[in-house]
């Protein structure tokens, strides 16, 4: 399992959202960290910039994958890509 680092901006968004939604997102992040090749992860490479996108319902998680899984942004669909 990879180590997960959540950046302050993403942590702030997670704290402000409903607990059930935040737990769903954190569960999906941890599932990806445990098995990056599972098809249920719903991961896509970002177009035009480095990083990957994790889809959790109407929420998107922008991450950088390497030795450490770096969670950069969490936001609603559409607004997270700015």
Where do the protein language model's features map onto the residues?
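Enriched for short, Lys/Arg-rich terminal
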Residues: 1-12, 16-23, 56-59, 64-82
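A short, surface-exposed loop/turn module that caps and links secondary-structure elements
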Residues: 30-54
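Short, intrinsically disordered/low-complexity patches at protein termini
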Residues: 29-30, 46-48, 62, 77-79
């Amino acid at each position: 399992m990879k180590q997960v680092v959540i950046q302050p901006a993403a942590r702030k968004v997670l704290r402000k959202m409903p607990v059930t939604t935040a737990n769903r997102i954190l569960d999906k992040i941890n599932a990806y960290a445990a098995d990056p090749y599972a098809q249920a992860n719903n991961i896509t490479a970002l177009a035009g910039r480095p990083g990957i996108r994790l889809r959790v319902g109407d929420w998107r998680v922008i991450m950088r994958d390497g030795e450490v899984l770096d969670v950069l942004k969490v936001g609603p669909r559409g607004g997270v890509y700015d």
